[in-house]
C-alpha cells in the first residue's frame, strides 16, 4: 500500500526540544502518528491508530494536544494518549479533514451527500455547520484537506471535479475555479494566491485567487535532486521557503 505522508511542523512543544527540529507526521497507510527528529529521523513518540482507521490530517493545537482525522471521525488526544474528545461521523460518510481554525477551534470536513463542514470550539462543541452538495456521489472521491482562509471562508479542493471552491461560513460559494489536477490540500500564500498540491498528478500549482488563472506549475522532475511523487501537503516556512510532503 502506498503511504501518503501528511506533515505538520510543530509550532509549540513545551517540554520538548526546539520546535523547528521536530515533525509530526501521519498518512494513509501508516498505522501510527509519529513525532520525528527532523535531523536524524528518529521516532521520539508514536500514537497507534485503531484497526481500519486512516489518517489524512494531523495538527498540534496551541494547548499542545494532537488533533487528527481517522476517516470515521476525528480525535483530540494528549501526549499520554488520553482522548480529550472523539467526534464520530455517520455511516456512508468519511471524515477526512481535521484542521485548526484561527480562533483555536477545529474545522472538520466530512465527505458525504451532502458534504458537511463543521466548526468545533476548543472543547469540541459544534458552533457552526455548512452543508454543500459537491455533486460527487462517491464520498471517498470528494476531498481530503480543508482549511480556513484568512478571511474566515473555507477553501475546498474537490478532487473528482478538479476544482477549488471558496465557501463562506454561511455556505455561500464565493468563488469557484477549475484547475488541471486533483488538489489534495491547499496553502494560502502571503499574496493571497493559492498553492495547491495535486497528489497523484505529481505536481503542485499556484493559481490566482481571484481569477483561477494558473500562475505556476512545478512538475515531478522540476526540482533538482528531488522527484515529486504523491504531493500531499505543502507548508510555508520562513525566508520564503516551503516544506513539501
Predicted regions and their residues:
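Residue-level detector of Asp-centered blade-edge/turn motifs that repeat once per structural unit
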Residues: 20, 60-63, 101-103, 148-151, ...
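Short loop/turn segments that connect beta-strands within beta-propeller blades
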Residues: 38-40, 78-82, 121-124, 168-171, ...
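Conserved beta-propeller blade signature
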Residues: 23-25, 65-67, 107-108, 154-155, ...
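Short loop/turn segments immediately following the C-termini of beta-strands
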Residues: 28, 71, 111-112, 159, ...
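Conserved small/polar residues in nucleotide/adenosyl-binding loops
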Residues: 242-244
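Surface loop/turn motifs at the tips and blade-to-blade linkers of beta-strand repeat domains
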Residues: 46-51, 87-91, 131-139, 176-180, ...
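Repeated scaffold domains used in trafficking and secretory/extracellular systems
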Residues: 53-59, 92-100, 139-146, 181-188, ...
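An edge-strand/N-cap motif at the start of beta-rich repeat modules
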Residues: 19-45
Amino acid at each position: 500500500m502506498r503511504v501518503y505522508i501528511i506533515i505538520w511542523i510543530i509550532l509549540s512543544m513545551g517540554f520538548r526540544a526546539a520546535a523547528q527540529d521536530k515533525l509530526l507526521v501521519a498518512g494513509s497507510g501508516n498505522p501510527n502518528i509519529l513525532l520525528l527528529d527532523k535531523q536524524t529521523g528518529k521516532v521520539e513518540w508514536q500514537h497507534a491508530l485503531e484497526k481500519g482507521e486512516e489518517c489524512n490530517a494531523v495538527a498540534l493545537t496551541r494547548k499542545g494536544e494532537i488533533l487528527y482525522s481517522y476517516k470515521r471521525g476525528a480525535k483530540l488526544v494528549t501526549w499520554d494518549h488520553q482522548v480529550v474528545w472523539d467526534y464520530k461521523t455517520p455511516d456512508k460518510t468519511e471524515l477526512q479533514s481535521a484542521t485548526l481554525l484561527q480562533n483555536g477551534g477545529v474545522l472538520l470536513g466530512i465527505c458525504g451527500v451532502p458534504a458537511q463542514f463543521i466548526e468545533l470550539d476548543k472543547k469540541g462543541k459544534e458552533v457552526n455547520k455548512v452543508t454543500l452538495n459537491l455533486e460527487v456521489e462517491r464520498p471517498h472521491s470528494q476531498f481530503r484537506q480543508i482549511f480556513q482562509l484568512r478571511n474566515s471562508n473555507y477553501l475546498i479542493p474537490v478532487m473528482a471535479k478538479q476544482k477549488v471552491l471558496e465557501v463562506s461560513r454561511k455556505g455561500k460559494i464565493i468563488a469557484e475555479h477549475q484547475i488541471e489536477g486533483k488538489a489534495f490540500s491547499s496553502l494560502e500564500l502571503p499574496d493571497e494566491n493559492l498553492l495547491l498540491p495535486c497528489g497523484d498528478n505529481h505536481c503542485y500549482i499556484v493559481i490566482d485567487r481571484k481569477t483561477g488563472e494558473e500562475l505556476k506549475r512545478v512538475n515531478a522532475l522540476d526540482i533538482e535532486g528531488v522527484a515529486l511523487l504523491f504531493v500531499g501537503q505543502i507548508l510555508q516556512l520562513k525566508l520564503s521557503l516551503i516544506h513539501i510532503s
